[in-house]
């Protein structure tokens, strides 16, 4: 028993240091968590526009297109980076109820352009740059 007590006294500082260093390395190596950002479909002044119209995000972030005030609105991606599918990212269903939303996670760096089918001619278009 005395043998184990003397070992623990000698190695306790070393063991503590090893645990501290290992914990620090594990925490510092953790990837940054992905963010969720919102784009309003329609402005607070009832204009048929996306707000903001242009957005920059990090790869892996999620964009929520939130129905604001009056619709109907949708999100159709037309130009996307190579390797992505515009139809797969798009939401053709028209949102009508305020507060309803459509989420999409963008993982490939590049520029994504999108529009609202009913209001494209009125300028309801936007871009997302993924870095």
UniProtKB/Swiss-Prot annotation:
Domain Plastocyanin-like: 35-131
SUPFAM superfamilies: Cupredoxins (SSF49503)
UniProt-recorded name of the protein: Plastocyanin
CC cofactor: Cu(2+)
Signal peptide annotation: 1-34
Gene behind the chain: petE
Primary localisation category: membrane
Species of the source: Prochlorothrix hollandica
Organism lineage: Bacteria, Bacillati, Cyanobacteriota, Cyanophyceae, Prochlorotrichales
HAMAP family in UniProt: Cytb6_f_plastocyanin (MF_00566)
Entries under PANTHER family matching the protein: PLASTOCYANIN MAJOR ISOFORM, CHLOROPLASTIC-RELATED
């Amino acid at each position: 028993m005395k043998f184990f007590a003397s070992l623990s006294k000698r190695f306790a500082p070393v063991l503590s240091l090893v645990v501290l260093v290992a914990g620090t390395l594990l925490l510092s190596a953790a990837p940054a968590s992905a963010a969720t950002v919102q784009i309003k479909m329609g402005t607070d002044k009832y204009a048929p526009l996306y707000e903001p119209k242009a957005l920059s995000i990090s790869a892996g972030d999620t964009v929520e297109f939130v129905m604001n005030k009056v619709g109907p609105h949708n999100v159709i991606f037309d130009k996307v980076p190579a390797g992505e599918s515009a139809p797969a990212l798009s939401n053709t269903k028209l949102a009508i109820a305020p507060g309803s939303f459509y989420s999409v996670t963008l993982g490939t760096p590049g520029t994504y352009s999108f529009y609202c089918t009913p209001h494209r001619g009125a300028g309801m278009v936007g871009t997302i740059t993924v870095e």
